[in-house]
């Protein structure tokens, strides 16, 4: 499994105005110690406290390589990322609000805490599904049975609606609509039998 660890940070600009500058180096060390002390693989979820003024990025070539060395596989941030090609080469995946050209003076403020990114509250250790489309934070307590449900629904789609749609060649309009309607009914009945609800095509 992949554990989720959270971080909030400032990327204050100009550098001289960063209220965390004096102890920034020690904060970085403590943050790395925190990440290093947790078994991987890990995803770091970062709340940028300066947004929408994301003048700099915590994530770039250097931090991507550091975090890969610390057992991290990706990050989700409502701030910015940079050095996208270099991050890819490091093997660190990322979902971010935007790109930027510099790192400014980015300082970790809190870690191991609840954060809010893209309107979603995320707690340390919370299960997350993430891909190129975005991410979902799974509510605590809902993890059990999730894999079984996902596999079932995928197979249900493939055996009903998708199967019918892919086999539509040569059917008349009337035949196609009849088969589609039946496949939707079959999908709903299978979902209802499994979960007590007809799913996405239900009432």
Residue ranges and their predicted role:
Residues 159-200:
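Glycine- and charge-enriched low-complexity intrinsically disordered segments
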């Amino acid at each position: 499994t992949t554990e989720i660890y959270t971080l909030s940070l400032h990327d204050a600009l100009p550098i001289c105005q960063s209220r965390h500058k004096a102890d920034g180096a020690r904060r970085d060390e403590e943050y790395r110690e925190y990440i290093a002390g947790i078994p991987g693989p890990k995803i770091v979820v970062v709340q940028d406290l300066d947004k929408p003024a994301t003048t700099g990025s915590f994530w770039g070539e250097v931090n991507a390589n550091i975090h890969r060395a610390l057992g991290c596989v990706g990050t989700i941030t409502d701030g910015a990322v940079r050095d996208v090609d270099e991050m890819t080469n490091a093997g660190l995946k990322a979902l971010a609000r935007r790109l930027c050209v510099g790192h400014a003076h980015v300082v970790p403020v809190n870690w191991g805490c609840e954060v809010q990114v893209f309107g979603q509250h995320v707690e340390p250790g919370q299960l997350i599904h993430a891909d190129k489309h975005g991410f979902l934070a799974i509510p605590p307590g809902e993890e059990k049975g999730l894999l079984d449900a996902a596999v079932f629904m995928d197979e249900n789609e493939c055996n009903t609606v998708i199967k019918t749609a892919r086999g539509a060649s040569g059917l008349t309009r009337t035949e196609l609509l009849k088969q589609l309607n039946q496949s939707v009914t079959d999908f709903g009945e299978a979902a209802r039998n499994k979960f007590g609800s007809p799913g996405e095509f239900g009432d």
